[in-house]
Amino acid sequence: MKKMMMTAMMILVAALCCFAGTHTHTITLVSRVEKQDAQYVIRNAETGATGASVVYCTDEIARQDVGTSFDIIQCNDSNGINKVHFTVSATELQAKVGGKLYGTNGVQILMNGVACGSEVSFTRTTVGAVAAGTVVEGFEVIWPTNASLVDATYEACVVLTATSL
């Protein structure tokens, strides 16, 4: 009897771990940061959009996911010293059940595992040409899941802005 109860508890714990995981996937948010007359142009690798800032909305994320990982990848063609100031904002969060949308709150941007609120800024310096594919910074956007929306899929909207210094 005791052995059966322990086995049942182990199965229950394993099942809970499957649904409470912190699975994330990586999306290349920026493939190039190009300098043009003291301005930086960002190109979104997923959509091809360019500009001084780029908005990226994730695809639907499965209900057991609690966040999405992003990489900022910088590539400059010049041979000088380049300083780029990045600002990341998580501006919208929503959960979808069937055709209905529900707002969620508590969004956090994590840099190196530290929660920084819904907006974070940082500056990076590059000297000379930076090889394509060099990761300048990685970050996660996380938010709490709502127990009453157990069948929801979640979407996050992230804005990345780069300015020259």
Identify the role of each PLM range.
Residues 8-15:
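Bacterial N-terminal signal peptides
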Residues 6-7, 68:
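Short amphipathic alpha-helical "recognition" segments used for binding
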Residues 96-117:
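A surface/secretory-pathway sequence property marking extracellular, secreted
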Residues 1-4:
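Positively charged n-region of N-terminal signal peptides that target proteins for export
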Residues 115-126:
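Short, solvent-exposed S/T- and G/P-enriched segments that are highly enriched in secreted/extracellular
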